[in-house]
């Protein structure tokens, strides 16, 4: 697909849609999903919360469980960009439940990682550590060893921030 072979062109193409809000619900949902994937690749901004809420409603009625979990992750991240952390956590919890019910462990790992990031941002390193550990177990279950290593690194960071450097070192060495 163009998204994988040339993400910059995908970004330009998606950006050429002047007013995405004028798209039908189906097309807006697809635009949001593709824009989220481009954001993951190029580290660009996600669609706005209102757009993602429409996409979420569409996927809830017409999408697969994987699509519902993925759009929930994007919506949560968009809430974080808007500094609406409580709303983000609520959406992440719903998306995690959907991902686990559909046994999409890789997606569950990413959702838990973003939840851990929120706890980290709030300075709640104990809850952050637990979420990163949960993410690591889901990544391992999905066979995503690269993301599993990053989650272990994040567990180590949480221990380091909690002044448990000996334990932090153990996790950082596991991640390596």
Identify the meaning behind each predicted range.
Residues 1-176:
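A "functional boundary" signal
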